[in-house]
């Protein structure tokens, strides 16, 4: 049975955007879908995007985070709090973690930009952030470890049991998202005024463009929902021997091939011809060659061209071998 069409946006409107802030609009949406989509995207954006942060430090002569450094105004606890605010932008694909050793001396202020001078794979986005202040005659050696992560990770999870005893693990804020908020307004479509418009505002630390952050969050949601949309879902026992695993591409293709032709934007003539031949899904359609279709009753070249364009837009083709997608095992 065909699913009734939903009122949904043709595209996402980017009202304004720079490296630190983006404002996006989704319209029209069915009643209730504004909060459904807005809340889901907000939670994913705030908690699940990857970023880079300092995960541990080592300071010569300091054994724990409650220590002090001679000639330095801030104690180690405050230095750590400042280091947690340093924001990194990934600039070299092959480098996803980096350890850097810095000698701080001959200066009254140690800033985040001084860390950036020693880095290879990262750029510091807030170079003016003050890490600590010290006497011009004071000096100390600090080693920083930068890693890739997701969301917020406490110091206990960053602690390496094999690390040197003087290494201090710290809390890490990996998320590149500063804030996300959304609002929902009424939107009119023809004579109906109860549709919704979702406005989503995303603030980042500059390491990712808001547009890319939104795309990444949507991708994470899609990957999770893909499993639930697959009709092969079944309750499994603890014995999983013989169960087959499918990668994401196969799962996506299975779902696509099971799509009903009645839900596609096809002419009535083409749909009636296919229905008369008991061809109801994309999977059933792509099994045929073009010559086979032309043998269908009342099926002409115009309908063939229409179907050919549809399959091409979906990266499908006539005569495909779809046995590996196991559509028959439902």
From Swiss-Prot:
Domain of life: Bacteria
GO CC list: cytoplasm; DNA-directed RNA polymerase complex
Coiled-coil blocks: none
CDD domains associated with the record: RNAP_alpha_NTD
InterPro entries: DNA-dir_RNA_pol_insert (IPR011262), DNA-dir_RNA_pol_RpoA/D/Rpb3 (IPR011263), DNA-dir_RpoA (IPR011773), RBP11-like (IPR036603), RNAP_asu_C (IPR011260), RNApol_insert_sf (IPR036643)
Enzyme class, first EC level, given as a word: transferase
Spans annotated as Alpha N-terminal domain (alpha-NTD): 1-231
Catalytic activity: RNA(n) + a ribonucleoside 5'-triphosphate = RNA(n+1) + diphosphate
Keyword check for Nucleus: no
Keywords in alphabetical order: DNA-directed RNA polymerase, Nucleotidyltransferase, Transcription, Transferase
GO biological process: DNA-templated transcription
Stretches the record annotates as Alpha C-terminal domain (alpha-CTD): 253-330
Signal peptide from the UniProt entry: none
Molecular function in Gene Ontology: DNA binding; DNA-directed RNA polymerase activity; protein dimerization activity
E.C. number: 2.7.7.6
Domain free text: The N-terminal domain is essential for RNAP assembly and basal transcription, whereas the C-terminal domain is involved in interaction with transcriptional regulators and with upstream promoter elements.
Subunit structure, as described in the record: Homodimer. The RNAP catalytic core consists of 2 alpha, 1 beta, 1 beta' and 1 omega subunit. When a sigma factor is associated with the core the holoenzyme is formed, which can initiate transcription.
Family designation: Belongs to the RNA polymerase alpha chain family.
Role, per record: DNA-dependent RNA polymerase catalyzes the transcription of DNA into RNA using the four ribonucleoside triphosphates as substrates.
The protein's name: DNA-directed RNA polymerase subunit alpha
Native source organism of the sequence: Parabacteroides distasonis (strain ATCC 8503 / DSM 20701 / CIP 104284 / JCM 5825 / NCTC 11152)
């Amino acid at each position: 049975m065909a699913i009734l069409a939903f009122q949904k946006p043709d595209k996402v409107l980017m009202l304004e955007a720079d490296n630190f802030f983006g404002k996006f609009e989704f319209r029209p949406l069915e009643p209730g879908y504004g909060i459904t989509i807005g809340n889901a995207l907000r939670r994913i954006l705030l908690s699940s995007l990857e970023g880079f942060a300092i995960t541990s430090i080592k300071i010569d002569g300091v054994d724990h985070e409650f220590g002090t450094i001679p000639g330095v105004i801030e104690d180690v606890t405050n230095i750590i709090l400042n280091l947690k605010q340093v924001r990194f932008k990934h600039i070299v694909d092959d480098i996803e973690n980096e350890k850097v050793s810095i000698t701080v001396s001959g200066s009254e202020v140690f800033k985040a930009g001084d860390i950036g001078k020693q880095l290879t794979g990262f750029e510091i986005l807030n170079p003016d952030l003050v890490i600590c202040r010290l006497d011009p005659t004071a000096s100390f050696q600090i080693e920083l470890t930068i890693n890739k992560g997701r969301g917020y990770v406490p110091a206990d999870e960053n602690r390496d049991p094999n690390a040197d005893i003087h290494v201090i693990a710290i809390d890490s804020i990996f998320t590149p998202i500063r804030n996300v908020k959304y609002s929902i307004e009424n939107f009119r479509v023809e004579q109906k005024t109860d549709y919704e418009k979702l406005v989503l505002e995303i603030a980042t630390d500059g390491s990712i463009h808001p547009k890319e952050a939104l795309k990444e969050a949507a991708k994470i949601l899609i990957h999770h929902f893909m499993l639930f949309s697959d009709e092969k879902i079944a309750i499994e026992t603890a014995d999983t021997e013989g169960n087959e695993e499918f990668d994401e591409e196969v799962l996506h293709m299975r779902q696509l091939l099971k799509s009903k032709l009645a839900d596609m934007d096809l002419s009535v003539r083409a749909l009636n011809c296919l229905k008369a031949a008991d061809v109801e899904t994309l999977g059933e359609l792509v099994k045929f060659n073009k010559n086979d279709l032309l043998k269908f009753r009342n099926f002409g070249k115009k309908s063939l061209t229409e179907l050919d364009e549809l399959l091409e837009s979906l990266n499908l083709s006539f005569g495909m071998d779809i046995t590996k997608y196991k559509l028959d095992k439902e």
